[in-house]
Amino acid sequence: MVLETRRRSLTTCLLLAGICLTGDGSYLFSQPSVVHWMARRYQTPFLQVIYDNGGWKSPKLSMLALHPDGRAAKARDLGVGFEPVPDHAGIAAAAGGAYARVVAHPGELESALEAAMDVVRRDRRCAVLDVKLPPL
């Protein structure tokens, strides 16, 4: 109960601050070009942080949990990777004029977050951080 309350509080804080945390697969299927174009049109800027592990981790883990000895578990390629690699941040920049930045190393994250939030607050436009994680 306490953990759930804390989790809701964090979610509420992120929403009130205009921060969206999204996996790369969810980002692609959320029609990001429309999202960022509409945000620009209606002047509703937000910061979107994309967790980019290069594929669909949830379907992979679900399949392996249900069928650990199945044929797919032994396959070299499960077909859940994103190749060619999409330019997640570039989609938002092209469609909605968003500030776009790729964060390739953990040491860059803090300064990237500060710069992105400055753009959202000062320039009143969206910002997208494509945070690279270890691949699937």
Task: Give the positions of each predicted feature.
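Thiamine diphosphate
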Residues: 1-136
